[in-house]
C-alpha cells in the first residue's frame, strides 16, 4: 500500500468512504469492496445494513445523552461548556454514521457522497474539539468565557469545513482531486486527526503529573487510549477474520464503534475526575448535604447553652468558631 491510498484499508474494513474511492473499473463504477462485511437484515420490507453496528450506534447515542446530562448538572465545573460541545459533536457524528451504516443513505444514492463527507467532517471536528479542550486545564484563558467557547467552536467548525470539503472534492473529482488521488483525503482524515489525539494525550499527562496529586486520572487516559487503539486494530486488521468466524453477522465495524464509545466514556471519566464543583454554588441543588449525626445529651447541651450567663448570646453555636483558613473567626 502506497502512502495516501485506501486500497489495503478498504479491503479489510467496511467504512463508508470506501464506496467512493479507488480506480474506476471497466464498467465505470468506483469503490473498493471489503473482503467480508456484515450481512443485511430485512425488517418490515426494509433492508438494513450493519444491524449489530446500528444497535451499537443507538446505545452510543443513549450513553452520550446521559453523559451530557451529568455534565450539565455540574454548574460550576471547569470546562463544562467546552466538554459539552465535544459530546454534542460526537452525538452528531454518531447520527451521521448511523445513517450511512444502516443504509438510510445507501451507496450509489446521490446523497451518499455528501453524507460521507459530513461524516469525515464531524470526525475531524471531534478530534479538533478534543485538542482545544486539552488547553482548558492549563488555564491559558478563562474557561466558559466567550473567548474560550468561540475559540473551540470556530476551530471545530474550521476543521469540519476543511475535512468535509476535501472529502467531497475527492469523491466528486473536483478541483484536481479524484477518487484515485486520495493523498489529501488521507492526510486530513487520518494524519491530522491522529496528531490532534496524540497532542491531547501528551498534554493531559503533563497536566496530571505537574498539577495533581492524585494519579488516578492517568488510568482514565490509559484506558481511553487502549480502547481507541484496540478498536482501530480490530477494524483494520481483524475485521475479515471476525466476519468470517461469526458467519457475517457482524464485522470489525461493530467492535470499532463499541471501542470508540468506551474511549469517549473514558474522556468523560477523566474530565469528571479532575473537575471539582464549588460547594457554595452547588449546595442548593443537592438536598440533605448536611445532617445531624447525633444529638448532644441533655446535660451537655445545657452546659453549652449557658456557658456564659453574662451574655445573652453566650449560647450561640458560632462562639469562637474556627475559620476554614486556619485563623480565628471575627464572629
Curated annotation (Swiss-Prot):
Sequence intervals crossing the membrane: 51-71, 83-103, 111-131, 157-177, 183-203, 223-243, 248-268
Membrane topology recorded in Swiss-Prot or TrEMBL: Multi-pass membrane protein
Subcellular location: Endoplasmic reticulum membrane
InterPro entries per the UniProt record, alphabetical: Chs7
Keyword Thylakoid carried by entry: no
Role: Chaperone required for the export of the chitin synthase CHS3 from the endoplasmic reticulum.
Family: Belongs to the CHS7 family.
Protein name, as recorded: Chitin synthase export chaperone
Organism name: Coccidioides immitis (strain RS) (Valley fever fungus)
